[in-house]
Curated annotation (Swiss-Prot):
Top-rank taxon: Eukaryota
Induction: Up-regulated upon fungal elicitor treatment or wounding.
Similarity field: Belongs to the CFA/CMAS family.
Residues that hold S-adenosyl-L-methionine according to the record: 91-92, 126-134, 153-158
Tissues showing expression: Expressed in roots, stems, flower buds and at lower levels, in leaves. Restricted to sieve elements of the phloem adjacent or proximal to laticifers.
Transmembrane segments annotated in the record for this chain: none
Reactions this protein catalyses: (S)-coclaurine + S-adenosyl-L-methionine = (S)-N-methylcoclaurine + S-adenosyl-L-homocysteine + H(+)
The keyword RNA-binding is annotated on this UniProt entry: no
Descriptive protein name: (S)-coclaurine N-methyltransferase
Length: 351
């Protein structure tokens, strides 16, 4: 596919000229190419590939290219996010116990699972790094009234939303700090720390975990959730010149996808207590539910897009960007029945 043809494909997708099933098939083609690129003939080669990336990350800054993250993803209108997500406004995977589980139920089930695996108990001090719209902090603070939750976000809109929800829910045990995690410093020490889908935009996990360990009490625990591939780890960069998919959502340099085992190579300042993996089917289904929510409310969705863009064409492109985002996530995490790309949970203690 020549550059001109790739640009035309993306333009037609964003204008809604390509059917969903065709887009999904194009995504699956790119996913298969990624696996062909990543899987090696011998275990020796496979391990060498992983360790090469581990060693290179240890020589990098904590995070790079953060300023290039697409604002469409991280500064989306609150009215839109309320349409897309469930009642807990969880911007990551839900936990689906069976086929009848709703999006709201899946959000609650996953948040309950976080609390259980992080061993949250009343009276603890809890830090939520990269707290997003506060799903973890708000849920935890409502369930554990004697805990004090501190959320850290770099988004003014997210901070305002969480503080508004605290007033609505009459929660006095949540505070939100506006800060960049890579430069954030505090003298406070916490019983528990959450890092849910934070490391994906980091590079040097060694520096990150060292920094986090300094905020942990001696008997504190760190709970991490991150998306992963079961074997492969790689920077999110195109496989070849024809790859339209890789940098469509995440610009080059802004995302590194870890393997399920990758953080085990970064135990200088923390040591793993436990690890779990969750089938990619959970995240795939969350993306499908988000897409359904958008399509069920398409008229309202279009009006929101029109309110933040200058032209009708830009509104259509933004609408289809979000639809394609959901299809990309659904296909990635659903690929091969959720047994390639998935989620992992890790619990660390301080060394």
């Amino acid at each position: 596919m020549q550059l001109k043809a790739k640009e035309e494909l993306l333009r037609n997708m964003e204008l809604g000229l390509i059917p969903d099933q065709e887009i999904r098939q194009l995504i699956r083609v790119e996913l298969e190419k990624r696996l062909q690129w990543g899987y090696k003939e011998t275990h020796e080669e496979q391990l060498s590939q992983l360790l090469d990336l581990v060693h290179s990350l240890k020589g990098m800054k904590m995070a790079t290219e953060m300023e290039n993250l697409d604002l469409k993803l991280y500064e989306a209108p609150m009215e839109f996010l309320k349409i897309q997500h469930g009642s807990n406004m969880k911007q990551s995977a839900g936990y689906y116990t069976d086929e009848s589980t709703t999006l709201d139920e899946a959000e609650i089930a996953m948040l309950d699972l976080y609390m259980e695996r992080a061993q949250i108990k009343d009276g603890q001090s809890v830090l939520d790094l990269g707290c997003g719209l506060g799903a973890v902090a708000l849920f935890g603070a409502n369930k554990f009234k004697k805990c004090q939750f501190t959320g850290v976000t770099s988004s003014v809109e997210q901070k305002d939303y969480i503080e508004g929800k605290c007033k609505e829910l009459k929660l006095t045990n949540v505070k939100v700090l506006l800060a960049d995690i890579t430069t954030y410093e505090t003298e406070e020490r916490f019983d528990r720390i959450f890092a849910v889908e934070l490391i994906e935009h980091m590079k040097n996990y060694q520096l990150l975990l060292k920094k986090i360990s300094e905020w942990m009490k001696d008997d504190g625990l760190l709970f991490v959730e991150h998306v992963c591939h079961k074997t492969l780890a790689y920077h999110y960069e195109p496989v070849d010149a024809e790859d339209w998919y890789t940098n469509y959502i995440f610009p080059a340099g802004t995302l590194t996808l870890s393997s399920a085992s990758m953080l085990l190579y970064f135990q200088d300042d923390v040591s793993v207590v436990n690890q779990w993996t969750l089938s990619g089917k959970h995240y795939s289904r969350s993306h499908e539910e988000w897409l359904k929510n958008m399509d069920k409310n398409i008229v309202e969705f279009k009006e929101i897009m029109r309110s933040i863009t200058k032209t009708e064409k830009e509104a259509i492109k933004l609408l289809n960007f979000w639809r394609i985002f959901c299809m990309c996530g659904a296909e990635l995490f659903g690929y091969k029945n959720g047994e390639e790309w998935m989620l992992t949970h890790l619990l660390f203690k301080k060394k």
